[in-house]
């Protein structure tokens, strides 16, 4: 048997939602791929149609390159995030610089992702959504992030959160509110709202968040995607618990 073609259910669900929502509410998410000339438009469609495992399979088969996928994600972020405001810090250069060092046998092969701005990524600003931490740059990544990168994920930036993750809406004085991609007048939920909005808008196929009392699940339900609270001891232990 050949490799299974992984096309995520959530993409089908979101496309169905798009047909029932007004164009003004969807703007600027709706039509971004068709508005981009080929080959960028083609890569944008692949970014939307495949989940992380499916994109990794395309990269492994040399149908596309990891750099092309990462650049397509960067293009989409540049096009949409002024309105959605999902990211607090971009790490595009860091991701592109690390791509050549991604081992060829990793699970994710350089697939792009994002990390909630509540977790240490070495050399990248971590603010906790607070003006108090705008100058905080950790020297070392937590074990969870190291495991993500060993698995071949390319981190493109940090995602917005309410200050110190203390709320079910993503809004703070430092960066402002994160809008729901399906209706920009509504909030993405919280506290992992930046990550949920980024996935729903098609920036990346998956993003990291934290969840103690619904912080992944609430924004996921607001944005129409899957959000998980991992069981204890089923992931790398440490701060990301």
Q: What kind of region is each of these model predictions?
A:
Residues 9-12, 78, 118, 219, ...:
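Small/flexible residues
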Residues 168, 196-241:
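Fold-level recognition of mixed alpha/beta catalytic cores in primary-metabolism enzymes, strongest
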